[in-house]
UniProtKB/Swiss-Prot annotation:
<dbReference type="GO" id="GO:0006260">
    <property type="term" value="P:DNA replication"/>
</dbReference>
<keyword id="KW-0804">Transcription</keyword>
<keyword id="KW-0158">Chromosome</keyword>
<dbReference type="InterPro" id="IPR019775">
    <property type="entry name" value="WD40_repeat_CS"/>
</dbReference>
<keyword id="KW-0539">Nucleus</keyword>
<feature type="modified residue" description="N-acetylalanine">
    <location>
        <position position="2"/>
    </location>
</feature>
<feature type="repeat" description="WD 1">
    <location>
        <begin position="32"/>
        <end position="125"/>
    </location>
</feature>
<dbReference type="InterPro" id="IPR036322">
    <property type="entry name" value="WD40_repeat_dom_sf"/>
</dbReference>
<dbReference type="GO" id="GO:0006355">
    <property type="term" value="P:regulation of DNA-templated transcription"/>
</dbReference>
<keyword id="KW-0227">DNA damage</keyword>
<feature type="region of interest" description="Interaction with HAT1">
    <location>
        <begin position="361"/>
        <end position="406"/>
    </location>
</feature>
<dbReference type="InterPro" id="IPR001680">
    <property type="entry name" value="WD40_rpt"/>
</dbReference>
<dbReference type="InterPro" id="IPR022052">
    <property type="entry name" value="Histone-bd_RBBP4-like_N"/>
</dbReference>
<keyword id="KW-0131">Cell cycle</keyword>
<feature type="repeat" description="WD 7">
    <location>
        <begin position="372"/>
        <end position="404"/>
    </location>
</feature>
<dbReference type="InterPro" id="IPR050459">
    <property type="entry name" value="WD_repeat_RBAP46/RBAP48/MSI1"/>
</dbReference>
<comment type="subunit">
    <text>Binds directly to histone H4, probably via helix 1 of the histone fold, a region that is not accessible when histone H4 is in chromatin. Interacts with CHAF1A, HDAC1, HDAC2, HDAC3 and HIRA. May also interact with HAT1.</text>
</comment>
Amino acid sequence: MADKEAAFDDAVEERVINEEYKIWKKNTPFLYDLVMTHALEWPSLTAQWLPDVTRPEGKDFSIHRLVLGTHTSDEQNHLVIASVQLPNDDAQFDASHYDSEKGEFGGFGSVSGKIEIEIKINHEGEVNRARYMPQNPCIIATKTPSSDVLVFDYTKHPSKPDPSGECNPDLRLRGHQKEGYGLSWNPNLSGHLLSASDDHTICLWDISAVPKEGKVVDAKTIFTGHTAVVEDVSWHLLHESLFGSVADDQKLMIWDTRSNNTSKPSHSVDAHTAEVNCLSFNPYSEFILATGSADKTVALWDLRNLKLKLHSFESHKDEIFQVQWSPHNETILASSGTDRRLNVWDLSKIGEEQSPEDAEDGPPELLFIHGGHTAKISDFSWNPNEPWVICSVSEDNIMQVWQMAENINNDEDPEGSVDPEGQGS
């Protein structure tokens, strides 16, 4: 009987998701300046824009690149570099153009948004997360289903993978006992990589160390303060010795690599009422950071007084797995997770007065809800070169590259109001 009820619930949920998606699609011309939807061969659990951009002469688009991965059913997995053509501001984008045969949106005049896979490198198991090294973006670290963290220099690998499926990383980083997701390169110290793991620890490597046999580098330091799965780790963006970590023990910990005590952080806070899945330091304000949790909230923190949570962002209906500050705007951050939504928040609107109708859609600081995904969002990335452009990937193979309409973040009242999720008013 329970099985029947579960099947019925699933069918109802699927119908609701489909209806919501239809409404979203109908409203895209009002809500977005750009939407590109691309079905990947396999879902990617990870997405990160590379920092470079090419602007071909005489063309109405620029070329950007993404680091992706695969999560296959039992077939060979790959680390993937893809290229994306984004239309210039003066190119005509027609959001109503949907190519049903290709299953992708994106006409700008006669040019359709091109997304192409450029490089595939054999990988051991799915790519839980992949992140490039800021000082040399050709170097990419990956988290695997094993305890190893792999490092690839993609310039040293052919763009088409060896059919044997042999995975040949340039380094193997050892120190963990289990897999995990958190991964962070130090932006101020080249080659210093942090990794978080299900084994309750955080490992630090210096990849400039001389590898042992088999290209293996052992962890330089192992931090053991958490008492449960460590979900995420992140270096501070200005201070080379500071980093933060979050875990299923509901704690946010701040660490200083100059301390000799690797089992006790500088600060430990009970950050949420459930597992803490992600964190992000503000690129403009050295004291501000955000954490996202299974308690469905994003929390805002000030390093100078961690006893006091500055704010709690509430609108998500389920666990939050990713939070990232905008690289272009000090007050803007985004969060995503299991509820299939990516929310963009604006700190500067906290506490603004709202009409009762507006309040029904969410708090004033909820700037935008991206409703284009029909499955859990695994990861997203703000484009470093094009303000307000985000790439998001979901568990159903879909990758979307999108930009909310300029009038939404410009504080101008658009003609005919549309609530943030495009469910029309």
